[in-house]
């Protein structure tokens, strides 16, 4: 029989791996964005996005831009493809994090 604790930790590992994939895809998107649309790159603070002095409001703008699918009108197909991928990874990572939280509550109640 599979241990519930081992299953929980496996789920946590999968969630962390997907977070790393999301982070990597976001960095790659910003590199593409710098080349194809410098104005949008500045609008979302692409240069300071991953720094300690990054502006959270501009970071949330990029998340909103991608989640609302406003990138579909963009002229660069590479940018559109990367945004689609990032949006899918964001939804997957959010769902996995929610599942980890529900599993944690379940484990606390179980034991």
Swiss-Prot record:
Keyword Heme among UniProt keywords:
no
Transmembrane stretches, start-end:
1-21, 90-110
Keyword terms: Cell inner membrane, Cell membrane, Membrane, Transmembrane, Transmembrane helix
Q: Which GO terms describe its cellular component?
A: plasma membrane
Q: How does it sit in the membrane?
A: Multi-pass membrane protein
* Keyword hit for Transmembrane helix: yes
Identify this protein by name.
Universal stress protein B
Q: Which species is this UniProt entry from? A: Yersinia enterocolitica serotype O:8 / biotype 1B (strain NCTC 13174 / 8081)
Its gene is: uspB
